[in-house]
Amino acid sequence: MSTRGYMGIKKKGQLKGQYNHFDSYISGLGKDIIETLNNIPKSERINKLNEVYDNITLVNENDTPTQELIDYAIENELYDGSVSNRSTKDMYCLFRNCQGRLDMYLNGLKYMLNGNDFLNDGLFCEYAYIINLDTNTLDICTCGNHLQLSVDLLSLNYNDIANAMKEY
């Protein structure tokens, strides 16, 4: 069974985030995000994450993709024709392969399928990971947007975080 979640970045109160279909628990998506963040030198981490946020353009799932978006998704190997409507006219298919891939955004990926509504789904959004640039923390939520833990972006230790999250 899939463990659905959310990955996003918050700046000046505004979220840019996406739905993640599987392995969203702390030992899956959570660990990937923490490891990816820890690969950025601490001296550069906050500035780099601000740049990433500023570079992201949200696209909506119900929008009709332009040819530019279709070409971009195919060129960047984001398209997955085995899900949903199996069409390049389906935004979910176009951006399926970047779900949960913070590393892709750190490497310049500029489009993100807007999953912000999913964050408020307390039943189906089991875990959420928000890089909060207003507080310079990684905010970890369960059951939608119920904050459970905030950890300084410059002090991320997976084992400590995993142990703290065991009670949730």
Please place each PLM-identified region on the residue numbering:
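Short, basic and Ser/Thr-rich N-terminal targeting/leader segments
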Residues: 1-3, 125
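Extracellular/luminal recognition modules and glycoprotein regions
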Residues: 3, 24-30, 34, 102
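Short beta-strand scaffold segments in enzyme catalytic cores
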Residues: 4-9, 129
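Short beta-strand segments
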Residues: 5, 15-20
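Short acidic-glycine loop/turn motifs at beta-strand connectors
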Residues: 9-14, 132-135
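Short, solvent-exposed aromatic-acidic interface loops
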Residues: 18-28, 145
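Low-complexity intrinsically disordered segments
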Residues: 40-168
